[in-house]
Curated annotation (Swiss-Prot):
Organism whose genome encodes this protein: Clostridium acetobutylicum (strain ATCC 824 / DSM 792 / JCM 1419 / IAM 19013 / LMG 5710 / NBRC 13948 / NRRL B-527 / VKM B-1787 / 2291 / W)
A GO term from the CC aspect: ATP-binding cassette (ABC) transporter complex
Gene behind this protein: ecfA2
EC top class, as a word: translocase
Cysteine disulfide links: none
Protein's job: ATP-binding (A) component of a common energy-coupling factor (ECF) ABC-transporter complex. Unlike classic ABC transporters this ECF transporter provides the energy necessary to transport a number of different substrates.
Self-association and partners: Forms a stable energy-coupling factor (ECF) transporter complex composed of 2 membrane-embedded substrate-binding proteins (S component), 2 ATP-binding proteins (A component) and 2 transmembrane proteins (T component).
Lineage, highest ranks first: Bacteria, Bacillati, Bacillota, Clostridia, Eubacteriales
UniProt-recorded name of the protein: Energy-coupling factor transporter ATP-binding protein EcfA2
Highest taxon, organism lineage: Bacteria
């Protein structure tokens, strides 16, 4: 489901002494099935933007087209949009409340007025989609689980409503390295296997490098840079000027290139660096 944002501006508390422009003439396009990541410091406009896409906030001016429908039009029913665009807030596990995992995931679909048979089908499917074995987890309390497992349950609760677009605000925040990798793996799988359009907000450049098809850099309420991994992460000077960085391994590769090693500059993950360094070492032996 493609998303197009045109000339989007949003002002908090307009006409008061506390007036603040959170988004300023933002223009972006996210293609159907794309994995888009927004990066930027706190206050740059990332979270405000994703709430606009879900219809939680109404823009001061501009348009948001989701599947060619302008959701800012007064005739559009926002409940219909929210069925298509799922939003997972930061630390979503704090919203878990039911006695069992099955009941918690079923809450959303059940409130959509679906039959119990359809609700059950969706719960099983959603649990499978996020890597939770139904029979092993369905009767457990959400509060027995690890942080990473709780987060999967929370994501499954949104996925069970079968959105075409899934938005996640800092989904790996507070998790240990294994938990981060597990969550990213499951989210990437949702995109690849189930053809979801994914929008993710992140502060971790390492996480971004593992999953992004397209990156949008937010700074001071504007989108100042966008493109694929190569296009954005090769703009090191621009990123550093706004207080951001590239993955640490990219700085290592840059140093090796300065020392004369014939290594590709487009290296953004540890796995890619490992392969490239081994290639160079093997070439040196010949």
């Amino acid at each position: 489901m493609p998303i197009k944002i045109e000339n989007l501006t949003y002002t908090y508390m307009p006409g008061t002494p506390f007036e603040k422009k959170a988004l300023d003439n933002v223009n972006i396009t996210i293609e159907d099935g794309e994995f888009a990541v927004f990066i930027g410091h706190t206050g740059s406009g990332k979270s405000t933007l994703i709430q606009q896409i879900n219809g939680l906030l109404k823009p001061t001016s501009g348009s948001i087209f989701i599947d060619d429908v302008d959701i800012t039009d007064k005739s559009v029913k926002l409940n219909d949009i929210r069925k298509k665009v799922g939003l997972v807030f930061q630390y979503p596990e704090y919203q878990l409340f039911e006695e069992t995992i099955e009941k918690d995931i079923a809450f959303g679909p059940r409130n959509m007025g679906l039959s119990e048979e359809e609700v059950s089908t969706r719960v099983k499917k959603a649990m499978k989609m996020v890597g939770l074995e139904y029979n092993d987890f369905k009767d457990k309390s959400p509060f027995e689980l690890s942080g990473g497992q709780k987060r999967r349950v929370a994501i499954a609760g949104v996925v069970a409503m079968e959105p075409k677009v899934l938005i996640l605000d800092e989904p790996t925040a507070g998790l240990d390295p294994k938990g981060r990798d597990d969550i990213l793996y499951e989210i990437k799988k949702l995109q690849k296997e189930y053809k979801m359009t994914i929008i993710l907000v992140s502060h971790s450049m390492e996480d971004v490098a593992k999953v992004a098809d397209k990156i949008f850099v937010m700074y001071d309420s504007r989108c100042i840079l966008s493109g694929n991994l190569d296009e954005v992460f090769n703009e090191i000077d621009t990123l550093e000027k706004v207080g951001l960085a590239v993955p640490k391994v990219t700085y290592l590769v840059r140093k090796l290139r300065e020392k004369g090693f014939d290594i590709s500059k487009d290296i953004f993950t540890i796995e890619a660096a490992k392969k490239e360094i081994l290639r160079v070492l093997e070439s040196a032996k010949r």
